[in-house]
Amino acid sequence: MADPSAFYEPEEDELLSQLAIPIQNYQPLSEGDEYRRLQQLEQHAYAQQTAMAQEQEMEQLAVLELIPEDVKRFLVMFHQAILENDLPTITSMYESGWNKLTQAHYLNNEWPEAELIAPLVGNDQVFLTLYRELYFRHVYARLQPTIDDRFQSYENICELFNYLLNSEGPVPLDLPIQWLWDMLDEFVYQFTSFSHWRSSPKAKTEEELEMLAESPNIWSSYSVLNVLYSLVQKSQINEQLKAERAGKSVEEVTEVAGEYGSKPLYKNLGYFSLICLLHVHVLLGDPTLALQTMENVDLGNAAFLTRITACHVTTYYHVGCAYMALGRWPDAIKTFVSVLIFFIRMKQYHTRSYQYGSIAKTCERMYALLAICTTLSPGPSDENIMTIVKEHYGDQLAILQRGGPEALEAFKDLYLQACPKYLNVNPPPYEDASALEAWLANPPADATQRHLELFLSDVQAVQGVNGMRNLLKLYTSIDAAKLAAFSVSGEEEGEEEVLQQLMVLKSASSTYGRGQAETTLLDGERKVTNNLDFTIDGTMVHVEETTSHRRYAGFFIRNAEHAQRALTSIKSAPLPVRKPASSSAPAPATTAAPISKSGESAAPAPAEAPAAPEKKAGTWVPKSRQARIAA
């Protein structure tokens, strides 16, 4: 039988009786004593808070002492310039001062954290947010970012954009266009970097897997596109560009822009957001939508984007890649050639720019893509650009034009070297363990490999009929049976097979291309992509060459300018100075004048001219020096 005392619970009075202080001896405090007790507690808590604040301040001062004095002066002056919206000073400090201090003190380590420099700038949160944007950009460029850096950079840039977009009115901030472009370009770069890093779960630690599972929306495609489209909508940039293209006055354009779009900060952010949308849509594999976002952006030589070389090169590179994805090879060639000519002319002004390295790499990738496009769509192009292409990729270009299995490998290598690093839209399901295991067991194909397969399928369709094109160049008209007998494959082919190859060649040799009157990037008309066209009448093939004549005017102008510069250089160069005779040489002996019969001395006979020094064998004299001596 169970013991009933096992479930006995003592009464409350019995428990209180066991306390050390009897309940009847307790005397409640008076109101005055209670007030004094609360006051003492408040004073004690305040003293503790003060001590902690002083301790933190001492720690901050100790850390601030480790920061170089020139860095502290720079941060104070930078903060003051931003408060005063002093645009020239901000531009100088951003483009020059920041990079010089980075080279001097923080080439291989981080800048001080924002919390450490907060006392120097009066804890200004707007400036600290801008400083963090530069801080994380430096981490991505010089160091290896950790997962905390990736998360914090996303939170900081979202905080900055929320401040710009969700304020009650336009924020009183003025930043240089170079900084605004770099900010948005870095935003897209960090998004692509995080997407590639997130797409490989096998290389993640347990802590990283947990953080990715808890934050599936960090650096998501939706959040990035939402920010860019919000900036476009807030600035009314498309409406402004349409009004400017329609020839409306400045007042009318300002009225269309509205309260936010009329401010340079929002207008420039909206304009650069269109270019970043082009970039993102190309990476996500939607070239049509990428070109649609640029329908109101002018790509001429006087366009706003040409003010920033990095923006100019990036825009044309992704427009050309979008055209390649659509199979519009002539438009891609025109786009690449246009920006490469600009880069060659402006190269001397950007060799010392901190962005010159990345710009040069992008141009090098465009040379490789140009080698691909000119092979798939042969035709006249700029000679200077094609000379550089042959210098850089001469061996690959010969293989591409020769055709065969080697050409397919060369196409593959050049494409992987120069194409954008495409992104997978759907990241691994880190938040679902079972789904992640299934994903690891059967991972999806890489986005770049999918685009490579599509590209190679187009190449194979064209390369399979290259021999047929070479045969057609020899005739103006030829029968299909005779063409089958001359087949380069070495196999006997009937008329039907030859006609099928001709139809494939006809289809592969035509595409859409922009004309002179086209306004948007997607508009175009049907064009022949090479210098050969033909028609089929029954079994007879009529061939017509469409090679355009070379324009000699530009050739003569360039060479005349080069000759004029050479002549000016020769005329401005100093003439050679003949060395004086050495003082140690003996003086020439003087002979006495002969005495005439009349007693007067006769005039001395004229001295013979010294013989010209013999020219040593093998001595080379520059032509420019010969010209100066002759002059």
From Swiss-Prot:
The lineage of its organism: Eukaryota, Fungi, Dikarya, Basidiomycota, Agaricomycotina. This is Eukaryotic translation initiation factor 3 subunit L. Component of the eukaryotic translation initiation factor 3 (eIF-3) complex. Residues 571-631 are annotated as: Disordered. Residues 335-526 form the PCI domain. It comes from Cryptococcus neoformans var. neoformans serotype D (strain B-3501A) (Filobasidiella neoformans). One of its GO terms (biological process) is formation of cytoplasmic translation initiation complex. HAMAP family: eIF3l. Residues 580-612 have a biased composition (Low complexity). One of its GO terms (cellular component) is eukaryotic 48S preinitiation complex. InterPro entries: eIF3l, PCI_dom. Keywords: Cytoplasm, Initiation factor, Protein biosynthesis. Component of the eukaryotic translation initiation factor 3 (eIF-3) complex, which is involved in protein synthesis of a specialized repertoire of mRNAs and, together with other initiation factors, stimulates binding of mRNA and methionyl-tRNAi to the 40S ribosome. The eIF-3 complex specifically targets and initiates translation of a subset of mRNAs involved in cell proliferation. GO terms for molecular function: translation initiation factor activity. The keyword Cell wall biogenesis/degradation does not apply. The keyword Protein biosynthesis applies. It comes from the Eukaryota. Its main location: cytoplasm.
